[in-house]
């Protein structure tokens, strides 16, 4: 452990033989946040913040929800440490040269917005100012290449006028990855606006695939075939159809994946149908999202794996429970979905909405027409005054 001025390293190097220490690569969790036990991991993290600690006035423990103070940490950083300067450490630094791999992204302009396209899912233009050619659906009545372009262009045009939630300086525009998938989860188009976060490339596809998957007529059968019939039964118990009769946004799927549903201080604290119950739930045991990827996750401990799940292409990089995607329809028939990732989830939702114009779900089957345990499911949520 080498942090600034080695403060965290020094704590780890002390004699903590009777406790679990983060240097053994074992994760820990706090099943009872009401007690005052202190984990070595938390002490190490706090030691690393010496000189760089968050101002007290903006820490999470300054927030009260229904009279309950949100915890920040169960420990305090040490008063001081005799730190070791990096230059005084023994040994010879080794700086291994790393060549940058060639990129699979090519400059392109979509709807007048400059960005990059993945050459695996589009024919890039010879000139960055020109549009790419996206892929047509192979399904009868599916999205054409021009319709994929239209959808991505509409989303891209909204992104450049959307006030970002995660960027400085204030007043910056959102920068996102935009993905459109077919009914079988195949990627029809990917576009990344300039300087969009790299992680969004994968997450945008996950979001699109999630909305498409849960909205498809075969969702229940597909989950059962993947050994996840428990979640199908839980959805049925909540009178949730996984037969294509409901159009699910990713915001709705996210609500149903929470360990407390409905969320809020006055909940009965039962879990959503796609979540493990409280007492069993943890960030390492979430529910359907993790169970779909668990086999490949374990396999990755012994070497690289080709894909995140053993599922078919519909969700073979897993599902996502963050908002920012909606299914796409033509003449009332599901033809795929659009997913957005790269800014706040409300901003992603807004940009996904813009992209879906012309291919929106019939209002009467949207998830916000469904009530689960007395609480309506959401469809999308937009920020107030979102445009620059």
Report the location of each language-model feature.
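Sensor-regulatory modules in signal-transduction proteins
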Residues: 328-330
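Juxtadomain coupling helices with adjacent low-complexity linkers
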Residues: 27-108, 114, 141-149, 341-388
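Serine endopeptidase catalytic core focused on the charge-relay Asp
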Residues: 38-45, 198-305, 351-354
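Single conserved hydrophobic/aromatic residue that forms the stacking wall/gate
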Residues: 1-20
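Short, basic/aromatic recognition patches
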Residues: 4, 13, 140-179, 204-205, ...
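Short glycine-/small-residue motifs
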Residues: 21-24, 189-190, 336-337
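Intrinsically disordered, low-complexity terminal regulatory regions
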Residues: 63-199, 203-215, 219-220, 384-388
